[in-house]
Amino acid sequence: MRSIIYAPPTPSPAAPSPSSARSRRIRNWAATAPIPLLLIAVILAPGAASQAAGTPSVLISDAAIAKLPTSGAAWTSLKKYADSDDGTADIADQDSNNDVHTLAEALVFARTRVESYRTRAIANLKAAVGTEKGGRSLALARNLSGYVIAADLVDLRLAAPDFDANTFRPWLRSTLSEVMSDGKTLRQIDEQRPNNWGTHAGAARAAVSVYLGMGSELARTAQVFKGWLGDRSAYAGFKYGDLSWQANPNAPVGIDASGTETYAAGSDIPLGGALPEEMRRGGTLQWPALYTGYPWEALQGATLQAEILSHAGYDSWSWSNQALARAAKYLTNTLKWPAIGDDTWQPWLIDARTNASIPLPSSTKPGKNFGFTDWLYG
């Protein structure tokens, strides 16, 4: 079997210095500038009100959303979710869809500025606070990201400043260290579980970190994610199960490295791009592999996490030789397990960021934590 040349890992992640330096220069200037000049700067700066009141956007800027279409199948699908019954906020229910309905409402508001969508989204945000009580960490990990992104899209810090400052933000901060019914916190799950639990937790942790402006927390999240993708020099603290799908059982990773394979059952078994911790859910190493939907489920969290980190300035899509693109191609091309159901949003985002050249579903369904990518990135 032809081996693929493996690109060595990039250095441990650090928040991009140019933007940080630029921010420091702006703060230093603001501290000494005459008041009239400050007023002029606020008036002229694009999105000045939002920037003055809070943190950078979590996932996508207002300017980017303004360029998206308000017609076509993808828009119609998004609008349907925004207009339909969004149910009841219940973060403790790991199968709740209220978060993605809230996200849909926020996206439609951000594009159309129709106030009724923001009103509904904010009502759901208020209802969601505290509903994680009694639930497992997986439920919190799945459901939290959509609410955080929605809060950013509706500009909660300006639309409902008292709620945002006194309730929503303190609550978000508490979710990172809140002990859930399984005895774990979101941080612990992110740093210990190299499966879908951990990737969803990482996405939620990244979203909260950006929304709250927690730079150190975001850097740690990026470090853990880089380790999961395959750079054990960045992080290697995960607890793995059956290692039979690992290309190197002595150095397990979340996604097997490029060009790796193993010999079993009388044949060479390709492993490059496999998610070992989820492939084992279909059974110990064998070929053909027994089908399991867990690899795509783990990629839900990983895909959103990569996009949040990328938007924050990290080169997350390229880490470990484009690990997420390799994983998607392994599932789609090698195993012939294309994304189906609530995983169909992933190929659109992965392909948009990596040119993976994987088949794009003609329509998508939102997943556990995100969706509407055929509209956002199509």
Q: For the regions a protein language model found, what residue spans apply to each?
A:
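Extracellular glycan-targeting catalytic surfaces
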Residues: 51-193, 199, 203, 222-237, ...
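Aromatic-lined glycan-binding groove of carbohydrate-active enzymes
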Residues: 216, 220
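A short glycine-threonine-serine/GTX helix/turn-capping micro-motif
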Residues: 289-293
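Secretory targeting and sorting signals
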Residues: 2-17, 22-52
